Amino acid sequence: MRVAHFIAAVLLAATARADLVPIPAGVYRPLFLGENDPKEIPVRAFSIAAAPVTNGEFLDFVRANPKWRRSQVKRLFADDGYLRHWAGDTELGTRCDARQPVTWVSWFAAKAYAAWKGGRLPTTAEWEMVAGAGFTTADGAREPEFVKEVARWYATPAPETLPAAGTGRANVFGVRDLHGLVWEWTGDFNSAIVTGDARGDTGLERQLFCGAGSVGAKDTANFPAFMRFGFRSSLQAAYTVHNLGFRVAKDP
């Protein structure tokens, strides 16, 4: 029985990784608004991978594109931590599994992979709209079970050994692992701070990192979104992080 369950989980993960899930048009409601900013941003229909890119999938990419191998990538495009958990340029080794989500990848590398697959990185609006969907409806904030589960995910430290991508519970669209597995790059990850230098904009810094302090108890479902925005605001495109991966999106 255990073997059967294991095989079923592996097949489920493989199917989820391979699938692009169609997402209908909708709206994204930004957390941080300027005086003249719209309260809602229209999001056109698109498709997004059901699960993050795995080590095995990224290995295929670097084998086909030598300039993105660990020893050959330019430091302009990835810092010293790039693919540090792999055993070599084209060898995963024993520290990671082919089915786990790839991490230690820069925004430049993630963008190149997505283009290689004929797609792109999802925009922040797209990613957040899909991530806001619950298990049974497109508005997860209205699902107590979903809100509780997401809060638990963000309060729990990441495991030392990541599980296989694509094994988390799917949301109403059929997308998995948006919460509780790894952080994910978006195509415009730094869009919240491009209007100024965050190092000198203390007001913006307070808004990004302390904004949750102004949210009442009824809005606790927003805390994970504040965490994501705070994390994104700290990134630069060449950065690599041990729990930062990505997934691919495509236009219709």
What is the role of each PLM region?
Residues 30-34, 189-197:
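Cytochrome P450 core scaffold surrounding the K-helix E-X-X-R motif
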Residues 42-146, 250-252:
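Active-site microenvironments of metalloenzymes and redox enzymes
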Residues 151-179:
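Short, well-ordered junction/capping motifs at the entry into regular secondary structure
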